[in-house]
C-alpha cells in the first residue's frame, strides 16, 4: 500500500482538478490510499461524487491555502503549520504518507518542503527533476529551477540523485549521466561545469555511468538517461521545450485545417497525428520531483488537467514504490565513504 498526501487547494483549479485526478490515479493503482488536505466547503461536495476514492481517502479540513502568486517567505509566515500545503508535506515528515503531491506555487512548495523535511545529510541544495520525453523514450533533467548557479560539488550531488531517480523510475541498473554544456569537448564550458565533470569521472561511481558533456539537442535525442545542469539553464531548457511543443501543435492544427484538401489529408493520416499529439501532450509527463529532501515531494503543473494531475500522482507512486529516498541515501553514503581518508595503520 502506498500512502499519498494531497494538497487539494494547490494549482489554478484546486480540488476541481486534484480530486478527479486522484480518482483517475486510483483506477490505475488500487493499492493507493490518500490523505487529503483542503477547505471542507469546496472539497467535500466534489469528493462525494467519487465513492471509491472517498473510501480510500482520509480528509483533513484546512482553512488556509497558498495562492499561486504568493512569495515563499510570505507563504511560510502565513501558512506554516496550518495551510493545506504545509500539512500535506508534514504528513510525509510524520511518517503518515510516503509521498506528497501538490500543484501549488513552486517557490512556496520548495520553501515549505525544505523547512519541514530538511535536506539530506551531505546535500547542500535540493534540485527539481523533470521527466523529459525523448526519441528513445524518456530521460530525466535536473535541476530545472531550484538552485541557480550550482557549483561543481552540487552538480555532482545532482548526478547522484538523478541516477538514483532513473533507477527508481526506469529500473535501469546503471543509468548514463551527462553534464549539459555548450559543447562536448573537455575544454569548453564554465569552470564549475568542467570541474564537475572531473569530480564525477574521478569518483568512479558504481551507481552510474558518466558519459561526459552533452549539448542541448542531446536532451530530446535521449543520448543519456540523466542530464545534469544548474537551475537557471535547466529552467530555460524546460520552458523552451514546452513552448516548442505548443508551437508545433499550433502549426499542425493550422496546416491541417487550412484547406479542404488538407482536411481530407488529415483524415487519412489521423492515426499518425494522434500518435504525435500524444507524444507532445504535457499531461503525459507531468510531475517534477524535488530531490535531496528527507521525503518525496512531487510538483504538478499549476494549470494541470485532471489527467495531468493523475500523471503526477503516478510519478509519486513509482518513486515511493521503488524506494527513491533510500536509493539516494545509499548512493550518497557510498560516495562519501569512498572520500573518507583511511584511519589507523592504513593511513601511515
Curated annotation (Swiss-Prot):
The name this protein goes by in its record: Phosphate acyltransferase
A single GO molecular function term of this UniProt record: phosphate:acyl-[acyl carrier protein] acyltransferase activity
Source organism of this protein record: Rhizobium rhizogenes (strain K84 / ATCC BAA-868)
GO CC aspect terms: cytoplasm
Quaternary structure and partners: Homodimer. Probably interacts with PlsY.
Main location (coarse class): cytoplasm
Gene: plsX
Catalytic activity entry: a fatty acyl-[ACP] + phosphate = an acyl phosphate + holo-[ACP]
HAMAP family, alphabetized: PlsX
UniProt KW keywords: Cytoplasm, Lipid biosynthesis, Lipid metabolism, Phospholipid biosynthesis, Phospholipid metabolism, Transferase
Family: Belongs to the PlsX family.
Pathway: Lipid metabolism; phospholipid metabolism
Cell location: Cytoplasm
UniProt GO BP: fatty acid biosynthetic process; phospholipid biosynthetic process
EC assignment: 2.3.1.274
Domain of life: Bacteria
InterPro entries: FA_synthesis (IPR003664), Phospholipid_synth_PlsX-like (IPR012281)
Function: Catalyzes the reversible formation of acyl-phosphate (acyl-PO(4)) from acyl-[acyl-carrier-protein] (acyl-ACP). This enzyme utilizes acyl-ACP as fatty acyl donor, but not acyl-CoA.
Amino acid at each position: 500500500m502506498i500512502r499519498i498526501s494531497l494538497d487539494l487547494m494547490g494549482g489554478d483549479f484546486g480540488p476541481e482538478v486534484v480530486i478527479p485526478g486522484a480518482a483517475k490515479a486510483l483506477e490505475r493503482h488500487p493499492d493507493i490510499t490518500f490523505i487529503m488536505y483542503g477547505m471542507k466547503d469546496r472539497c467535500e461536495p466534489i469528493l462525494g461524487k467519487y465513492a471509491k476514492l472517498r473510501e480510500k481517502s482520509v480528509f483533513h479540513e484546512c482553512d488556509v491555502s497558498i495562492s499561486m502568486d504568493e512569495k515563499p517567505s510570505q507563504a511560510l509566515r502565513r501558512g506554516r503549520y496550518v495551510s493545506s500545503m504545509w500539512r500535506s508535506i508534514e504528513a510525509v515528515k510524520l511518517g503518515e504518507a510516503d509521498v506528497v503531491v501538490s500543484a501549488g506555487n513552486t517557490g512556496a512548495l520548495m520553501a515549505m518542503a525544505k523547512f519541514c523535511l530538511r535536506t539530506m545529510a551531505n546535500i547542500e541544495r535540493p534540485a527539481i527533476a523533470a521527466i523529459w520525453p525523448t526519441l528513445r523514450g524518456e530521460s530525466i533533467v535536473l535541476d530545472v529551477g531550484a538552485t541557480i548557479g550550482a557549483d561543481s560539488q552540487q552538480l555532482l550531488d545532482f548526478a547522484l540523485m538523478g541516477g538514483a531517480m532513473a533507477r527508481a523510475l526506469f529500473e535501469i541498473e546503471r543509468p548514463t549521466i551527462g553534464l549539459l554544456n555548450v559543447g562536448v569537448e573537455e575544454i569548453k564550458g564554465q569552470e564549475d561545469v568542467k570541474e564537475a565533470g572531473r569530480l564525477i569521472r574521478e569518483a568512479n561511481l558504481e551507481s552510474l555511468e558518466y558519459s561526459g558533456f552533452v549539448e542541448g539537442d542531446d536532451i530530446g535525442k535521449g543520448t543519456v538517461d540523466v542530464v545534469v545542469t544548474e537551475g537557471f539553464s535547466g529552467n530555460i531548457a524546460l520552458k523552451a521545450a514546452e513552448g516548442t511543443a505548443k508551437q508545433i501543435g499550433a502549426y499542425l492544427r493550422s496546416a491541417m485545417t487550412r484547406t479542404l484538401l488538407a482536411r481530407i489529408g488529415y483524415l487519412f493520416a489521423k492515426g499518425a497525428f494522434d500518435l504525435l499529439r500524444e507524444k507532445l501532450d504535457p499531461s503525459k509527463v507531468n510531475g517534477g520531483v524535488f530531490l535531496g529532501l528527507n521525503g518525496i515531494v512531487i510538483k504538478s503543473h499549476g494549470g494541470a488537467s485532471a489527467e495531468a494531475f493523475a500523471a503526477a500522482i503516478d510519478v509519486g507512486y513509482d518513486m515511493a514504490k521503488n524506494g527513491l529516498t533510500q536509493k539516494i541515501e545509499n548512493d550518497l553514503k557510498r560516495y562519501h565513504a569512498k572520500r573518507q581518508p583511511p584511519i589507523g595503520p592504513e593511513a601511515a
